């Protein structure tokens, strides 16, 4: 049984090592994170009636951008606990998470376990044209390359703010403010 784990680990580690060696210096063309300095997630127009009530939104995508300080700490902490426990400690890519995912996938002979950090997910979400949702090695390599660049360019709080305003939360709702309004009829700060 132990032999199976060793073989599985080698079968996964060798191709990953080769891919890093081959694609690391050259690799796919990845977007430039410097352009995100002025980035604002797209928001749907909001139309109000004469009495001040919001007219129902007909847009397929709803988003309301909020500042980091408007998002309750319990929500920020909860997201980090679920999505990326070591967010405050790593430099964009969580090597322990990568090793954990490789080990679990190798020992189960499946690809169920992921290792995307919040910066990696943010890269995928803000560059949908360059990093399509379909799983591919080139997309993952770009995410791995972009995450440390995001960490160099932005403070952790800025990354979390961008992520929480960008993330899709179901029912056409993007970002935590739109989700709070859509699901609970309240602002995220409430």
Where are these regions (language model features)?
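N-terminal type II signal-anchor transmembrane helix
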Residues: 1-47, 86, 106
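Peptidoglycan glycan-strand catalytic modules in the bacterial/periplasmic cell-wall system
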Residues: 42-44, 48-190
């Amino acid at each position: 049984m132990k032999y199976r784990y060793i073989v599985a680990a080698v079968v996964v580690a060798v191709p990953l090592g080769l891919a890093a060696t081959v694609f690391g210096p050259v690799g796919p063309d990845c977007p430039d994170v410097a352009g995100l300095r002025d980035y604002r997630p797209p928001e749907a127009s909001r139309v109000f009636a004469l009495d001040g009530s919001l007219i129902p939104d007909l847009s397929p995508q709803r988003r309301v951008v909020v500042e980091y300080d408007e998002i309750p700490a319990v929500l920020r902490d909860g997201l980090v606990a679920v999505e990326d426990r070591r967010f405050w400690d790593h430099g964009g890519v969580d090597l322990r998470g990568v090793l954990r995912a490789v080990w679990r996938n190798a020992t189960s002979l499946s690809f169920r376990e992921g290792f995307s950090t919040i910066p990696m997910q943010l890269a995928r979400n803000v560059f949908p044209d360059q990093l399509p949702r379909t799983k591919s090695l080139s997309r993952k390599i770009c995410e791995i390359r972009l995450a440390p660049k995001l960490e160099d360019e932005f403070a952790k709080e800025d990354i979390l703010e961008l992520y929480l305003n960008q993330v899709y939360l179901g029912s056409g709702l993007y970002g935590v403010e739109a989700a709070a309004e859509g699901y609970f009829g309240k602002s995220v700060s409430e």
